[in-house]
Amino acid sequence: MSVISVGQAIVLGAVEGVTEFLPVSSTGHLKIVEGLMGIPVDDHAVVGFSAVIQVGAIAAVLVYFFKDIVRILSAWGRGLRDREERYHHDYKFAWWVIYATIPIVLVGLAAKPLIQGPLASLWVVAGSLIAGSGVMWAADQLGRHKRGEDDTSFKDAMLVGSSQILALLFPGFSRSGATMSTALLLDLDRVAATRLSFFLGIPALTGAGLYELKDALGVGVGAAPLAAGTLVSFVVAYASIAWLLKFVAKHSFNAFVIYRIVVGVLLFGLLGAGVISS
């Protein structure tokens, strides 16, 4: 029998889709909802399920940015064949994404027992939500927002890509929140910071989902819940991406800062009152 029902999978897929690319921590929200539904957040199958449904959200990014991805991969392919093409920004950007993914892969493999153990606690999630809000507020205030997407460099990609480790070690910090905050501190404008966060998330999140797939299928999560959760995640994430890009073009990140604090405080309250367990 599956530890997650189809109905629960649909709810979790919607939560994943809404929050994966918003700087509010999809992992944190998934753990909160899992706790409220009585699903053991540290169960190996549940952790695997959460990673797999991320693939639906990543598929939404691939579809939404299909033309950009084809352009970048085409430039990369031309550069591999022709040295003259290697000065093209898209060719270099493709390599930057690859290099920037290496740190999170190494840390993820080395620290997997810790990540799926003590650091999976909802107390850690609550604290990370609040701490991350402070970092995001400071980054949005201190960043000069003067550099566009064409101004990104190898240094930018490596620093932003490496910042994903914060969310890996401290669920609740938010991968998107960490990457967007780092990009803002590097003076990228909000739209450029958001798009860079999307592109850097593609290999890391896809790899995590595929890596966990065999475990999720083998230890208590059925194919039907996985399919339902992933499909819902895709549909909702696509809408979330479109909304976020329009939002950051005209607004600051203050709304997300306030929301994170409220959710973090609420989670501390629920844990303290014993409504949900850590």
List each language-model region with its residue ranges.
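Multi-pass membrane proteins that catalyze or facilitate reactions on polyprenyl-/lipid-phosphate substrates
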Residues: 1-278
